[in-house]
């Protein structure tokens, strides 16, 4: 795809929310200028109309007194408010797909919940599909309909979120869930996954998780498992599903 072709779908068909809103926003421009620029470029509307639309979207993501605050600079907002601005900016051209990359990074628990509620409202009110990239299993459980578990840049397991949490079908997924602290169990130490994260420049020829897998088979190191589909679930593992511990 050429850069020109990609520009046609960027913002209009899909948009992205990045991890750090402070570095994603231009510190030298007012919020109104940054948001209006997107609409003027992709929709060809006047600056005054673009600013009005920016105010409407800031109000939609629950920024108080949006008409006044749209004239402020990024440093005048808290981290949570900056993330709301990024969400509003991503909605300017009403994309069909919104990719949120760790949208709650460096936010406290209360603000995290508020941001996730805003994303849930966006999904419902705007009819936008959301791909959430995160390491937070609690957020996955509370927000996602479907989950893809990845390791070493490859999909290990995929399926409805409730099913994956209740019955993991891959040793890596099982290890992740066991490492989550539980309030209903009195455990002296947390479970961990042995070994080190993968070196992406030197992945093994077989399963990328094989160097750390506690249930490794003879062919796991040499042969990459194919993704098999069973109902609404898919997984890539040589180990039979019933033997996953």
Regions inferred by a protein language model and the residue ranges of each:
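ABC ATPase NBD coupling module
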Residues: 1-15, 33, 41, 163-168, ...
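ABC-type ATPase nucleotide-binding domains, specifically the catalytic core motifs of the NBD
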Residues: 1-6, 29-49, 59-63, 159
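Hydrophobic anchor residue at the start of the ABC signature
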Residues: 35, 87, 111, 115
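ABC ATPase nucleotide-binding domain helical subdomain, centered on the C-loop/LSGGQ "ABC signature"
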Residues: 44, 48-63, 70-71, 166, ...
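Short catalytic/signature loops enriched in Gly
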Residues: 64-68, 158-245
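Conserved ABC ATPase signature
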Residues: 72-77, 81
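P-loop NTP-binding/switch modules centered on Walker-like glycine-rich loops
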Residues: 94-103, 107-188
């Amino acid at each position: 795809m050429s850069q020109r072709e990609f520009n046609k779908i960027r913002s209009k068909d899909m948009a992205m929310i990045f991890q750090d809103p402070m570095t994603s926003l231009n510190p030298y421009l007012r919020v109104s200028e940054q948001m209006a620029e997107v609409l003027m470029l992709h929709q060809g509307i006047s600056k005054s109309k673009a600013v009005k639309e920016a105010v409407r979207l800031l109000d939609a993501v629950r920024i108080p007194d949006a008409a006044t605050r749209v004239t402020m600079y990024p440093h005048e907002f808290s981290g949570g408010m900056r993330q709301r601005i990024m969400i509003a900016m991503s909605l300017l051209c009403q994309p069909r797909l919104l990719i949120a990359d760790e949208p709650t990074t460096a936010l406290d628990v209360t603000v995290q919940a508020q941001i996730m509620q805003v994303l849930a409202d966006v999904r419902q009110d705007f009819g936008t599909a959301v791909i959430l990239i995160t390491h937070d299993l609690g957020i996955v459980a509370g927000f996602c309909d479907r989950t893809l578990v990845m390791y070493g840049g490859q999909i290990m397991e995929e399926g409805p979120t409730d099913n994956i949490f209740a019955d993991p079908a891959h040793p890596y997924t099982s290890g992740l869930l066991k490492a989550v602290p539980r309030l209903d169990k009195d455990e002296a130490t947390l479970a961990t996954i042995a070994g080190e994260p993968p070196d992406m420049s030197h992945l093994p020829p077989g399963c990328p998780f094989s160097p750390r897998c506690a249930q490794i088979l003879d062919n796991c190191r040499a042969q990459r498992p194919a993704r098999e589909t069973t109902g609404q679930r898919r997984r890539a593992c040589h180990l039979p599903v019933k033997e996953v511990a």
